[in-house]
Amino acid sequence: MSSPIVLALEHVSRSYPGGVTALDDVCLTIAAGDLLAIVGPSGSGKSTLLNIMGTLDLPTTGTVRIGGQDVAALSDRRLSALRGRQLGFVFQQFHLTDGLTAAENVATGLLYAGVPRKQRRLRAAEALARVGLAHRMRHQPHQLSGGEKQRVAIARALVHEPALVLADEPTGALDSANGAAVLALLLELHKENTTIAVITHDQDIAARLPRQVSMRDGRIEGSVRR
């Protein structure tokens, strides 16, 4: 039995004024449990694709479906709710809030989900334990290494149990040792059936993931499963 489709892009293009085409007829499906790399050089369209997958931008033409819903048919409010419920984001620069502990930063991922404060704290602690940081819950960002900050960011993306985690260059700001540790964590989360799309320019990272989607000039050049 095939896994349910989490996200589907159907003939998606994105153009900007001046005749710039960032995406050109992109078709892509991500099934539950997938761990894939979307890889390509600078200017290949990866960032635009990330924004459209994350519903932060809409295509000029084509259809984006998340959990079977056409996002273009949703009001801004319903789209925001879908994004907050179905998607988790991990960024290269972590985007943690200074002055908040690791647990408090993770709990912010539940602020708009109507989760009571006590439950937010409990779920934040569980998410941090899941990424190996149960012992750092009370530490603030300036007390954490780069690798630990990225683990906190991953915990924040996971805390509301999204259908899909979008990770934008998650090892890009890290040294090789911390980058390898974060990649190992993503592989471990994949074993737990977390669905993750990693956007990267790094061919070595892409080669270690079970599925690789290659982009160039706004188009998908190929898709390989290992």
What is each PLM-predicted segment?
Residues M1-P4, R226:
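Short, low-complexity, intrinsically disordered N-terminal peptides in bacterial proteins
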Residues P4-M215:
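ABC family nucleotide-binding domain
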Residues A73, R225-R226:
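Short amphipathic beta-strand/extended segments with alternating polar/hydrophobic composition
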Residues Q212-V224:
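H-loop (His-switch) and adjacent beta-strand-loop-beta switch element
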